[in-house]
Amino acid sequence: MAVGTTTGELRELSDDELTDKLRESKEELFNLRFQMATGQLANNRRLRVVRQEIARVYTVLRERELGLAAGPGGEDS
């Protein structure tokens, strides 16, 4: 997942694409935690950024679930 993905950009994605981004971000977080445990992590800030991206994806999915935001193209998913 690219650094700096905004909530607005995430809102333009379909539910399937959001699920894929969530899976990718969780995999990246797992790998970063593993690197930290083995002392190979050079950029500690990346952990925080990835956690924030995961939270943004969950936020967009929850908005759609509650009907607070429409899916891409203005239609509910």
Curated annotation (Swiss-Prot):
Q: What keywords is this UniProt entry annotated with?
A: Ribonucleoprotein, Ribosomal protein
Instruction: List the Pfam families hit by this protein, alphabetically.
Output: Ribosomal_L29 (PF00831)
Q: Does the keyword Ribonucleoprotein apply?
A: yes
Report whether Ribosomal protein shows up as a keyword of the record: yes
Q: Which GO terms describe its molecular function?
A: structural constituent of ribosome
Query: How is this protein annotated for GO cellular component?
Result: cytosolic large ribosomal subunit
Any GO BP annotation: translation
> What family name appears in the similarity comment?
Belongs to the universal ribosomal protein uL29 family.
Q: What is this protein called?
A: Large ribosomal subunit protein uL29
Source organism per entry reads: Mycolicibacterium gilvum (strain PYR-GCK)
